C-alpha cells in the first residue's frame, strides 16, 4: 500500500503526477497532478492505491473522496489524439502532465512522477518507478486520471457504439477489434499505432 513517506521526507508542497492512456488504440492520454496541503487522513489514505489494482467501485469512492477533500489540490490535463499523432505518445504524456501541473494553481517544491523517464516540468522532479503503489500523492493522481479518462471514453462510446469503449476504455480488446472490422476507423483512433495503421494500409491496398 502507498504511504506518505516520500512527501514527508522532502517537506514543502509535494505533488504526485501520473498519466493514464498510454496504450489504448483510441482516445486521448490524461494526466493528473495531486498535492496535499496536509497529510491525508487515515480514512482517505485507506482508499488510495494504484488505480489499476482497485475495483471500479472503490476507485470511484476514492475519486469522490479526493474531489471533496479541501486539502487536496488537483490538476487535470490531457493530450488529444491529434497531438499524440503529431508529437508521439511519450511526448503527449509529458504534455498532459505539464497541463495537469499548470492547473494545480501553484508551483510545488517537488514533483513525484510515476515512471523512469522525466518530463520537463517547472519544478524539481523525482522519478518513482511503480510510484502509484508507493506514494499516496501519485496513487491519488492515478485514480483521478483514470476515472476522468474512463468517463470521457464512456461519453465517446455514446456516439461510437461499435467499439465497446465504455468497457475497454479504447484498449485493443477483441470487442474493439471486431468493431474496427465492422465500422472502420474513427477520428478518435490513433492512426500511428500499429493495429490501426496496419488496418488503414490493408484497406488502401485492397481498394
Curated annotation (Swiss-Prot):
GO biological process, one term: DNA replication, removal of RNA primer
EC number: 3.1.26.4
Residue intervals of the RNase H type-2 domain: 12-205
Subcellular location: Cytoplasm
Cofactors demanded by this protein: Mn(2+); Mg(2+)
Superkingdom assignment: Bacteria
Enzyme class at the top of the EC tree: hydrolase
GO cellular component: cytoplasm; ribonuclease H2 complex
Binding-site list for a divalent metal cation: 18-19, 114
Annotated CDD domains: RNase_HII_bacteria_HII_like
Catalytic activity: Endonucleolytic cleavage to 5'-phosphomonoester
Record SUPFAM superfamilies: Ribonuclease H-like
Manner of cofactor binding, per the entry note: Manganese or magnesium. Binds 1 divalent metal ion per monomer in the absence of substrate. May bind a second metal ion after substrate binding.
Segments forming a coiled coil: none
Gene Ontology terms for molecular function: manganese ion binding; RNA binding; RNA-DNA hybrid ribonuclease activity
Keywords: Cytoplasm, Endonuclease, Hydrolase, Manganese, Metal-binding, Nuclease
A Pfam family per the record: RNase_HII
Job description of the protein: Endonuclease that specifically degrades the RNA of RNA-DNA hybrids.
Family from the record: Belongs to the RNase HII family.
Family annotation (NCBIfam families): PRK00015.1-3 (NF000595)
Protein name: Ribonuclease HII
Organism expressing this protein natively: Gluconobacter oxydans (strain 621H)
Gene name per UniProt: rnhB
Amino acid at each position: 500500500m502507498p504511504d506518505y513517506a516520500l512527501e514527508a521526507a522532502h517537506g514543502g508542497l509535494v505533488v504526485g503526477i501520473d498519466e493514464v492512456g498510454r496504450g489504448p488504440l483510441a482516445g486521448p492520454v490524461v494526466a493528473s497532478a495531486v498535492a496535499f496541503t496536509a497529510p491525508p487522513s487515515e480514512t482517505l489514505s485507506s482508499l488510495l492505491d494504484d488505480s489499476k489494482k482497485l475495483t471500479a467501485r472503490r476507485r470511484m469512492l476514492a475519486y469522490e473522496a479526493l474531489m471533496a477533500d479541501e486539502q487536496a489540490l488537483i490538476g487535470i490535463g490531457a493530450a488529444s489524439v491529434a497531438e499524440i499523432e503529431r508529437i508521439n505518445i511519450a511526448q503527449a504524456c509529458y504534455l498532459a502532465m505539464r497541463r495537469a501541473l499548470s492547473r494545480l494553481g501553484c508551483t510545488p517544491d517537488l514533483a513525484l512522477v510515476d515512471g523512469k523517464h522525466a518530463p520537463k516540468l517547472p519544478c524539481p522532479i523525482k522519478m518513482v518507478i511503480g510510484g502509484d503503489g508507493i506514494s499516496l500523492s501519485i496513487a491519488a493522481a492515478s485514480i483521478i486520471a483514470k476515472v476522468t479518462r474512463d468517463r470521457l471514453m464512456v461519453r465517446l462510446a455514446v456516439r461510437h457504439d461499435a467499439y465497446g469503449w465504455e468497457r475497454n476504455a479504447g484498449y485493443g480488446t477483441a470487442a474493439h477489434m471486431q468493431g474496427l472490422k465492422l465500422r472502420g476507423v474513427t477520428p478518435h483512433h490513433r492512426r500511428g499505432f500499429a493495429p490501426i495503421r496496419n488496418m488503414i494500409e490493408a484497406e488502401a491496398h485492397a481498394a
